[in-house]
Amino acid sequence: MRITLNELLDLDYEGVARSIEEFIKGYVESSGAKGVVVGLSGGVDSTTTLYLLVRALGPERVLVLVMPDSDVTPEEDVHDAVGIAERLGVRYKLIDIKPIVASYLVAMGEAPDRRSKGNLRARVRMTLLYLYANMEGLLVAGTGDRSELLIGYFTKYGDGAVDFLPIGCLYKSQVRRLALHLGVPEKIALKPSSPRLWPGQLAEDELGMKYEEIDLILYALFDKGLSPEEAAKATGLPIEKVRRVLELHRASEHKRSLPPAPDPAATVWRFRRRKG
């Protein structure tokens, strides 16, 4: 068996788009929400998600929050995000989260490490999304893709805290193809991925491999059901990379699960006092 990237990418993308749009419409309608709010970074995932939301619900039911940290976010990303929001005719708000993040540091009286501060930025954005969702009766649409979800490349209770994930069924490389099909500008569709949690952060540099490799490995492991050794042979990728992806998946299981609690039957009810 030989698995190539083309096996993942050879899709009817209009069919994929329509199927996701039906999912969006059905979920929003069943919730009773007035519409959705979504964070727009100017990257491929959030932009593709926004295009699908607008196609499914219409621009009048979509609120966009552009939430840069002016210490970290490149001006180009802000320009791209605002340009897309205006192009699609959606209502948007531009909120610099720098002073909000700074207020945490002042209250703490100490400086956290880079990763902790970066995750704080993601969690500040989450609180703003849910603030507007509460005020306006909206659902929070997530922008994570399947690659990120399976390897845990998101902030717990940050960008991972959402009501639903329209592109959570698509690998990153598939999202890029869908973006081009939907008419997302090429500069955004092909822009290197980055959570923008600290200056100069790039996803592939941090992960140590390209998303095309990650997607092939995930497809081999989770869609084809291959063992790590079989996946390495089928994809032609080093077994070390396969094991790295599998370890990322296992180590991030807590991000994809509800917090555990003791079993009431074993922990509570068996200690019921007997009368008489």
UniProtKB/Swiss-Prot annotation:
It comes from the Archaea. One of its GO terms (biological process) is NAD biosynthetic process. Its EC number is 6.3.1.5. GO terms for molecular function: ATP binding; glutaminase activity; metal ion binding; NAD+ synthase (glutamine-hydrolyzing) activity; NAD+ synthase activity. ATP binds at G39, L40, S41, G42, G43, V44, D45, S46, T143, K172, S194. Homodimer. NCBIfam families: nadE, PRK13980.1. This is NH(3)-dependent NAD(+) synthetase. It comes from Hyperthermus butylicus (strain DSM 5456 / JCM 9403 / PLM1-5). The lineage of its organism: Archaea, Thermoproteota, Thermoprotei, Desulfurococcales, Pyrodictiaceae.
